[in-house]
Amino acid sequence: MNKYTVKEIQALLQQIDDENAPLFKEIVQDERKSVQKLVARWYKQKKQEEQAKRQWQEMSRYERQLFEQGIEYIAGIDEAGRGPLAGPVVAAAVMLPKDAYIPGLNDSKKLSEAKREMLFHMIQSCAISIGIGVVTAAEIDEMNIYEATKKAMIKAVEQLSPKPDYLLIDAMTLPISTPQQSIVKGDANSVSIAASSIIAKVTRDHFMKQLAKQYPQYGFEKNMGYGTAQHLEAIRVYGTIDEHRRSFSPIKEMIEMKKEGKEYDQTHRQSIAGFSS
């Protein structure tokens, strides 16, 4: 087997999919440590690929059932930003084709930022259509976060073209006529919802990073609007901006205390430590 250099073997392994291939069996017999490392890496990669395929099959079961019923356009819907103290709530609706395969797709919360960004672009390239719905902090204060989330989701659905035949929604029911199913933990159980969770999360993160350039004192590029200790301290020192949700605790209490001429002290900060995320 030494007729091949290690670099050549590395290139050959990238072309082999079956461990029963004659060439692979020949490579396995090569006793050079560097070659054996390449073989071990090949097995690890194939194992990861098989796991990704199994995960895709498991997460595609809702979509498969609908496709088998003759339903053509299925949209997954999810949101990002229900819990933060600042920024909008963003919803996404994503329609994937029947033959879609995006390995590694999962609930956005389980993925690193780099992985989310990579999948974000893969979804954009693969999807039949993507809709984005944004509801501002001011609107959230007017109607409450639950109603604001529904509004964002409906706005996202309305952007889809062609119009969806069926909706798969993460733990929510929408007051629209399109047939739909609410799925608990949908972003971990449906590829369409998982795709929408990534689109929503990355879209919102991009918005918050841009907002951080305008208001660097709040650290939005790191906390994404969540109530970290640094963010709460910045609110105490600099006050709020239009993107802050004044109906959310502890901002609501901080504003009331300021009106009363009271200082938001360390005791209060400790009492709301659970608001960090």
Swiss-Prot record:
Cell compartment(s), UniProt: Cytoplasm
Highest taxon of source: Bacteria
Cofactors: Mn(2+); Mg(2+)
Top enzyme class: hydrolase
EC number: 3.1.26.4
Reactions mediated catalytically: Endonucleolytic cleavage to 5'-phosphomonoester
Binding residue positions for a divalent metal cation: D78, E79, D170
Entry keyword Phosphoprotein: no
Domain (RNase H type-2) ranges: 72-260
Cofactor: how and how many bound: Manganese or magnesium. Binds 1 divalent metal ion per monomer in the absence of substrate. May bind a second metal ion after substrate binding.
InterPro entries assigned to the protein according to its UniProt record, in alphabetical order: RNase_HII (IPR022898), RNase_HII/HIII (IPR001352), RNase_HII/HIII_dom (IPR024567), RNaseH-like_sf (IPR012337), RNaseH_sf (IPR036397)
GO molecular-function term, one example from the UniProt record: RNA-DNA hybrid ribonuclease activity
GO BP term, example: mismatch repair
Key words, A-Z: Cytoplasm, Endonuclease, Hydrolase, Manganese, Metal-binding, Nuclease
GO cellular component, one term: ribonuclease H2 complex
CDD domains with a match to the protein in the record: RNase_HII_bacteria_HII_like
Role played: Endonuclease that specifically degrades the RNA of RNA-DNA hybrids.
HAMAP family xref list: RNase_HII_B (MF_00052_B)
Record-stated family: Belongs to the RNase HII family.
Protein name per its UniProtKB record: Ribonuclease HII
Gene name of the encoded protein: rnhB
